[in-house]
A protein has these predicted regions:
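Acetyl-CoA-dependent GNAT
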Residues: 6-9, 17-90, 99-101, 105, ...
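Conserved GNAT acetyl-CoA-binding A-motif
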Residues: 106-119
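Extreme N-terminal starter segment of soluble prokaryotic enzymes
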Residues: 1-3
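Conserved catalytic-core motifs of GNAT/GCN5-like acyltransferases
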Residues: 115-117, 132-150
Length: 155
């Protein structure tokens, strides 16, 4: 059974592990190895520093059997920044639930439009959640260009 809660100090290492596993095991079908390595380096990430912005945002985690298996965060302005689910827990509705709860929180705080930079891997997921393509986008990480899609949803 999945339990839902806000991020807590001490979650950082588990959150970074979910991020890295999700990128390298799930997104590899849509991105080459050099882009995956730039997006989610498998070594050298400081979990506390990487997670620091999550404590400024509305951040939820999904917990199963005492382990974090997913997380998502949204800024106060309505930018859905990170949505990641462990490869072992994909397809169970975890991301849908996390996004839905964050959308409700945003609406309750007066946000009427949510934006997200969706990876190629997550594009179909966000379309199914009612997000619409705004434009194709390129980000650069460590000199490597990585494609994604800016999407938006009116709530």
């Amino acid at each position: 059974m999945i339990q839902w809660r806000s991020i807590q100090h001490g979650d950082e290492a588990a959150i970074v592990a979910v991020f890295i596993a999700s990128v390298h095991q799930v997104a590899r079908r849509d991105y080459p190895p050099e882009q995956l390595a730039a997006w989610a380096p498998e070594t050298g990430i400081d979990p506390v520093a990487w997670c620091a912005p999550l404590f400024q945002d509305d951040t939820l985690v999904a917990v199963s059997a005492g382990r974090i298996v997913g997380f998502a965060n949204m800024t106060l302005a309505g930018y859905l920044d990170r949505v990641y689910v462990a490869p072992t827990h994909q397809g169970q509705g975890i991301a849908s639930h996390l996004v839905s709860v964050l959308e409700r929180h945003a609406r309750a705080h007066g946000v009427h439009r949510i934006t997200v930079a969706a990876s190629h891997t997550a594009l179909a997921f966000f379309k199914a959640q009612g997000y619409q393509v705004v434009w194709a986008n390129i980000v650069e990480r460590d000199g490597v260009r990585i494609g994604n899609t800016i999407m938006a949803k009116v709530i």
